[in-house]
Amino acid sequence: TGHMLLVDEFISLNASTDFKEMFFVVIQLGAILAVVTIFWNKMWPFQLKDKTQPVMKKDTWSMWFKTVVACIPGAIVTILFDNYIEAHLHTAVVIAIALIFYGIAFIVIENWNKTRTPKVETLNDITYKTAFLIGMFQVLSIIPGTSRSGATIIGALLIGVSRVAAAEFTFFLAVPVMFGLSALKMIKFGLSFTSAEFAILIIGCVVAYLVSIVVIKFLMSYIKKHDFKIFGWYRIVLGVIVLAYFALFA
């Protein structure tokens, strides 16, 4: 969302402010469908026995219950403060500061983790307590530029979750979170679209889906052999560029 808000500062979408606020959230459903596509086998809680009889996968059901627990803190904070955040913090400067701050956090935490062995190696090792703690970190993502996935991954790394398990649980969390946020934004917008607005939403979702398929596959392959420091440096550089631009030209 932070990236989209920044792009809108330079190439503004020709639409009402209310529609853009809804659009920046709802098109991320395309990214969520990409997550479901890639992680279908892990996310779908049923499997066929002898190709005819469906059998429940207990580990998958358990992971979804943990996901619900992790979503509770963020849901409460979003309902209480979403309007305030939209009105006061959706600015390029706030986004840039958040980019830099959490970029530094990624680098510091990865350096600290060099001497630590993860306590939680796999997705199924995540407990309800761990899930709730990760959910508390997800609350930070209500600040534009923080990155929901960045906040949850940083939180997971801090409490001893491996990189791969942290990323996978973040993707689990994304499904109910983004569906919930999208529903909230659409209800606030009024569920009334012009044909042009509807077309913009569909195109945005399709593009988000296609790009996300490539990015998620790359990310999961990359973190099996590397840490997150490169993403930290990227955030810092982008944040500095944005601050410099608005200091000089705004």
Enumerate the predicted regions with their spans.
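Multi-pass membrane proteins that catalyze or facilitate reactions on polyprenyl-/lipid-phosphate substrates
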Residues: 1-250
